[in-house]
Amino acid sequence: MVDMSTRVVQISDCHLFTDPDAELRGVRPHDQVRRALQHIREHEPACDVLVISGDLAHDELRPTYVVLREMIGDWVPRCRIIPGNHDHRESMHDVFAEIVTPEQQEVCFEQQLPGWRILGLDTHIPGEVPGEIGDAQCQWAHDQLSAEPDCPTLVFMHHPPFSVETPWLDKIGLRNADRFLELLKPFPQVRIVCCGHVHHEFQRDGNERQYLTTPSVAVQFRPRTKNAEIDTVPAGYRVFDLHEDGSYETEVVRLAPAG
């Protein structure tokens, strides 16, 4: 019997501007995102789902989402998006209408895969840096998880509901992390919770569940620091291979330095 597997590629924290020459902490996000998407097309041709886990834009302007959509091109149908603290929900609904659930204010998603489900949750609070899972989103997540209690599930969200052992970043994570983790307790099928926001790779295992973060495709932050420090490691993205039997592998792929 042939094992059916699905390749999910996650990029995070694009921080795009409408102006392609705009810089953020010494890098041009426009160039970085274009390089990342080109690398994924060349090296991950088996990509079935492309997840962008928040901070698609930095300036929160509608034209910036149009720029990103043009970069993604014919891969838009396989793309799934959730907002970060720098995003603008209405623009995401408008520009990516065919991949965003129209009847919800939140920008979230659910997708059934062979042997797995993936969920994307909206943790955006307009005008603030930390995140939160609101009442409506908690109920939606509960309903989704209750519907398929035996299906291994991968949850994406922007703000980590766990410590990344970096004090200044832990202060701007998910405000109501305890509520979210309590919500997950009756649902052991949630095998992985994977986030962005912190601009570096992190992994923690606990309670038969893996907690991950994925580096930015733009600027990298040095982990385990008291204050924000830029790291010199290359930008990257994460790849998941989700197998029909419920097993999986994941790794972070780093981009070669621009030159």
Each model region followed by its residue ranges:
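N-terminal active-site segment of His-dependent metallophosphoesterases
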Residues: 1-67, 71
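Active-site neighborhood of phospho(di)ester-bond hydrolases with catalytic His/Asp-centered motifs
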Residues: 10-12, 48-55, 79-85, 122, ...
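Short, basic/glycine-rich phosphate-binding loops at helix/coil junctions
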Residues: 13-18, 47, 116-123, 160-163
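Active-site environment of divalent metal-dependent phosphoester hydrolases
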Residues: 16-20, 58-63, 85-93, 126-129, ...
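Short glycine-enriched, charge-decorated loop/helix-capping segments at active-site entrances
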Residues: 22-28, 127, 166-172, 226-228
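His/acidic metal-ligating clusters that form di-metal
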Residues: 35-49, 130-210, 246-249
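Extended active-site neighborhood of metal-dependent phosphoesterases/phosphodiesterases
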Residues: 62-147, 152, 176-189, 207, ...
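A short C-terminal boundary segment appended to hydrolase-like catalytic domains
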Residues: 238-259
